Amino acid sequence: ERQYEQEMAMRKELEGGNYTAEHPYVVVNPYFVNPLTALLLFNTEKEEAVTLTVKGKEAAGDITHTFPKAKEQILPVLGLYPEYDNTVVIMLEDGTAYDVTVTTEKIENMPYQADYINTTSDYMNGQLMFVTPAGDSLAGGYDYRGDCRWHLVEPFIFDMKPAANGRILIGSNRLLNMPYYTAGVCEMDLVGKIYTEYRIPGGYHHDQFEMEDG
């Protein structure tokens, strides 16, 4: 309900404001569970395939994605650094680009840097390494440098798998029974919007898989 109300408020603000690629509506942590994400909302005069780049602390850390054509742009921003003035570049189809600063706040009880990582930017190829907990810790995503670029502040636990529709499946944050039985499995996107909680009689823990029929 809280996420639904937030989404309705964001849409109302977009419709009532004069937001453009140069001056977008920026919402950090739009669904309350991932403070290293944001939404950029604005309108374009015609349908455009907008490209977003979250600038890394060095060039190899850039994360870029091009979105399908639309006039109403509601664009997820992934890969922000914590407690940092992140630069996000909005590029239109004609090559016009605008820089937007997305500032994130300090996150308590979260390691900003992995203790050890041994990989390269070429091997990671713009991807993040996701780690999920089995207990009191919280899920995170780390880049080739070991910098945290994705973090859930609610205890979604155990296995995290990509779903066929592009979302993720991860254990619910609602504890059902001790020591680790949760209510079921959540289907969410990487920004943190929860689409469905699949409640499992007796609870869920450790692992799940998506069947061929979904």
What are these regions (language model features)?
Residues 68-76:
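Aromatic sugar-binding surface patches on proteins
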Residues 28, 59-67:
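Low-complexity "stalk/linker" and mucin-like segments enriched in Ser/Thr/Pro/Ala/Gly
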Residues 5, 12, 16-54, 73-74, ...:
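Histidine-/acidic-rich catalytic cores in large beta-rich domains
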